Amino acid sequence: PKEKREAKLSYDPVGWHNYKFYYGDGSKEAWLMNRGHLVGYQFSGLTDEGRNLVPMTAWLNTGAFTGTDDKNQSSMLYYENGLDSWLANHPNYYLDYKVTAVYKDNELIPRQIILQYVGIDQDGNLLEIKLGSSKEKIDKYSVTHVALDNVSANAEINYADGTAKNT
């Protein structure tokens, strides 16, 4: 997308609750949850779109309790930035990218986010993409699979109803 995305999201995904919890040594507070994009704005252009938003911990979404840490391999941001760089470095190639929220039974909050990605060259050949994460597993078709847990070290999450307790 050429336009900057909206600064604030207003859509509340199913199961949405938010809590300001203490973290670290207990002297700082941060919001536990984000309205997390399954497919990042830089790839989809979707911002406040319900079909693309789920409750994600800030840790899963941005890699940090506050701010961002795109070096955190347990975060969506690590893979989104890595894939965005891969596309920038391969302007004549395509990215096939699938993101799946994984729920157990009738839970409202996803327990995991599964990423699958592969490059495609001008001739339609599949190209392995390895971003350097220990979480990446590549299958026989060159598709990379990553499973990310929707957790936070400072919280116990009730995935069935979206509530949480500070730990």
Regions picked out by a protein language model, each given a short descriptive name:
Residues 1-167:
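Domain-level detector of nuclease and nuclease-like folds
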